[in-house]
Amino acid sequence: MGLALILVINPGSTSTKVAVFRDKEPVFTETLRHSTEELSKYKRIIDQFEFRTQAILDMLKEKGISLSQIDAIVGRGGLLKPIESGTYIVNEKMLEDLKKAERGEHASNLGAIIAYTLAKEHNIPAYIVDPVVVDELEDVARITGLPEIEKQSIFHALNQKAIARRLASDLGKRYDEVNLIIAHLGGGISVGAHRKGRVIDVNDALNGEGPFSPERAGGLPVLDLVKLCYSGKYTFEEMKKKLIGKGGIVAHLGTNDVREVYKMIENGDKNAELILDAMAYQTAKEIGSMAVVLKGKVDAIGITGGIAHNEDFVRRIRERVEFIAPVYVYPGEDEMLALAEGAYRVLTGEENPKTYS
């Protein structure tokens, strides 16, 4: 086929990112910002559908792009039921689940709905790629010490998978031929064991497992946490916020920005140095535990996410884990490219689209 034009739609809480790719090369990327005032009119996230769709159409018109030129539309996948990794065709069942939002209200739920609506009018395919609910855990990885609590797979699937594919390619191999450990360092930190193309274990980076991060508490001594819950000082919502949003570095140092922490260290703040080092230490420890999951057969370790831009922080992790396997660094995250690549693999026949059921 000739060059494919792919429209990418990635709704976030206060913005919608839109891009057009020609094959895997970006033609443009735009961030449409939505004020709190604009969004406060809508009771549920699903109610923002028409408002956001219109904003996208207006922007495409400004850019002189007609939907009739587009070969496929790909949206950010939302909170669906657990599914295996891949590129999925948006179907009625998926739309129904996203509209019900039984697994949670999140702006990413709109990605598939908007993509489908625009694609339907022009008879082109709509896809989603590797949503956060990707679940390829082995049964043994789900078990905890309490039968009422099962471990869940919630992680930065889109970026982890995209970086794992890139790393495999840099090794001259296919993703399903290698064993990798990928650490995503962002507002949350997720470390995944990728065995031959499947993430067979990963810490639940959202709900309090693994390393603490700039704004999440990570794994904690359980009984001390229970005591805190019953201290009478906090409501359920306050405790939740303490763990997710106000935990980790922000709880210790009052900022969730690692660059600010480095300024504190430069000014001689010994406590800031210790906290930062502890975050690197816990991340390295999690990488070590994933090496055990892979029985020591690790081809490479990939470090990605916003914090990977910081060479000193990467060094702190690297010096603890490079005995396991070579360490490759891919700073930042490019969700738009990862989504476009997912659609591209299907359009070129490299991968078959999956069906959500």
Curated annotation (Swiss-Prot):
Signal sequence, start to end: none
InterPro entries per the UniProt record, alphabetical: Aliphatic_acid_kin_short-chain, Aliphatic_acid_kinase_CS, ATPase_NBD, Butyrate_kin
In which compartments does the protein localize?
Cytoplasm
E.C. numbers: 2.7.2.7
Organism of derivation: Caldanaerobacter subterraneus subsp. tengcongensis (strain DSM 15242 / JCM 11007 / NBRC 100824 / MB4) (Thermoanaerobacter tengcongensis)
GO MF terms listed in the record are: acetate kinase activity; ATP binding; butyrate kinase activity
Keywords assigned: ATP-binding, Cytoplasm, Kinase, Nucleotide-binding, Transferase
User: Which family is annotated?
Assistant: Belongs to the acetokinase family.
The answer to whether keyword Zinc-finger applies is no
Specify the protein name.
Answer: Probable butyrate kinase 1
Q: Name one GO biological process term.
A: acetate metabolic process
Lineage of the organism: Bacteria, Bacillati, Bacillota, Clostridia, Thermoanaerobacterales
